Amino acid sequence: MLSRTVPRCVKYGSTPKDIRYGMEARNALLAGVENLVKAVGVTLGPKGRNVILEMPYACPKITKDGVTVAKSIEFEDSFENLGANLVRQVAGLTNDNAGDGTTTATVLSGAIFKEGFRSVASGTNPMDLKRGIDLACREVLISLAEQSRPVTSKSEITQVAMISANMDQEIGSLIGDAMQQVGKDGVITTQEGRSLNTELELVEGMSFERGYTSPYFVTNTKAQRCELENALVYVANRKLTSVAHILPALNYAIQQKRPLLVIAEDVEGEAMHTFLYNKIQGRISGCAVKAPGFGDMRINQLQDIAVFTGSQMISEDLGLSLDQNDFSERFLGTCRKVTVSRDECILMEGGGSAIAVEERVQMIKDMISAEDHEYNRERLVERLAKLSGGVAVIKVGGASEVEINEKKDRIIDALNATRAAVSEGILAGGGTGLLMASLRLESISKDRRLPPDIRTGVNIVKKAIGLPARYIANNAGVEGSVVAGKVLARKDPSFGYNAQTGEYVNMFEAGIIDPMKVVKSAVVNACSVAGMMITTEAAVVEKDLLGREKRIEDEGMEDKEKKRSVDKLRKQVNEAGRTDAQDGAADEV
């Protein structure tokens, strides 16, 4: 039975806080930052080490992915955890923007905060220090742009993927082949295979740049994606706002015991509440996605989706309304697999007729030939690529679940790095690009026209951006400062250290390259978050009443005064519990 939502009012009570100020606050933040950076930093470079993570209710996970390590670390001390959370934010932002470079971003933010903290402790003005950090960040980006080169060949694409996958030639070749088959803007996705070997398969599919309308639709919490199998597809060229707009499709999907994908101009109000409530209650699995494009472009793209999935687009222009009496199961299409992330929807093996899809493709080709306007032609070419390009699926194989998950993490990193390289070009890898950028900051840090505290901020960034190269060398068993000194002495943006072989080489010729977008995102996010941390003067966390009670009892404090403290704490906890229960009962009423 389909259920509708009932408006509820939820009350939230305040909790006691712990506050620390000045040096005490920054010391606690720094402790959390340093411990997190130490754990993440060991994974950097081709000879970086793995980290083994305890997983609740599952076997341990072995990974070399910086953001995975960062997200798994929690500290008992709330203030230390506060600092670690800020660095985790840097890793997360970099991962969202570029899909890779999380370890570099973590190392940079930790170094900038640590040196900035020391400077503030010695009397430097924190606001001027941040201005210097921001100035240095802009100059580093200029230097990186001057060093970057476009990606022009399949071999360069393969090399970028191989480096990001920890020098795995097989993964590099698979991603190079996948991009060759579906194009640089094509869709490449991963899934767990059923054999020992990792394989590449090209399937019918299309994608568009729109994500889920609510995080409550997420089914894979680790990847933050909604994944649906054998889904029904409902396409509408209008806003769905009332229950009547979505009820017929929901009822049919529940009867068929199949998930439902809704693609419409928007899904809001009662329609969204009803869909979400029944999803949360477990009556139906599904997802709502906004339609791509605007105006006539949106109508055309919705029609492309309808043809691919075998659905009929609901549009009043076509004489089709959303009235219950007009609904028919023929309006719904099908799709073998749907993957929806925060900003992309991928449809694989739609239920549309192959003849209808081919006719649609030919129609778009004819429109491209007849179109004179460059902008319109580009949009038509995009539609053609999405409808006819297919989806490359990398099926990850392995002997165990641990091996498959570890390899899948590396493939996803390699895919993201490769896409970043294609979009914004490449730099010499191994931290060489950032070392060369530090030379640009050398002259700025000596500019006497700048206030001393701003120059100090520039110097902090100059020192920090040399650390990735040092970490890579240290993890390879070589003295990092010696390697950095030799590379800087050459002042050649293509000259660097190959940590895999222990040789100094031309990084581009050796295929040791980093995507410009990845390095840029790491620098920008690290400078932004670390700069804000330096200017922190107070830190506020919630008091742990239950934890304090346990500590007092464990220490065997038996005098009356301390027993009264325990009783008081118990009373506070019990009152808080009763208040929550009363609020919950009120909400149910």
Swiss-Prot record:
GO terms for biological process: protein refolding. Induction: By heat shock. GO terms for cellular component: mitochondrial matrix. Its main location: mitochondrion. GO terms for molecular function: ATP binding; ATP-dependent protein folding chaperone. Gene3D superfamilies: GroEL, GroEL-like equatorial domain, TCP-1-like chaperonin intermediate domain. The keyword S-adenosyl-L-methionine does not apply. The keyword Ribosomal protein does not apply. Keywords: ATP-binding, Chaperone, Mitochondrion, Nucleotide-binding, Stress response, Transit peptide. Pfam families: Cpn60_TCP1. Residues 550-589 are annotated as: Disordered. Coiled coil: none annotated. InterPro entries: Cpn60/GroEL (IPR001844), Cpn60/GroEL/TCP-1 (IPR002423), GroEL-like_apical_dom_sf (IPR027409), GROEL-like_equatorial_sf (IPR027413), TCP-1-like_intermed_sf (IPR027410). Residues 550-581 have a biased composition (Basic and acidic residues). Belongs to the chaperonin (HSP60) family. This is Chaperonin HSP60, mitochondrial. It comes from Leishmania major. The gene is HSP60.
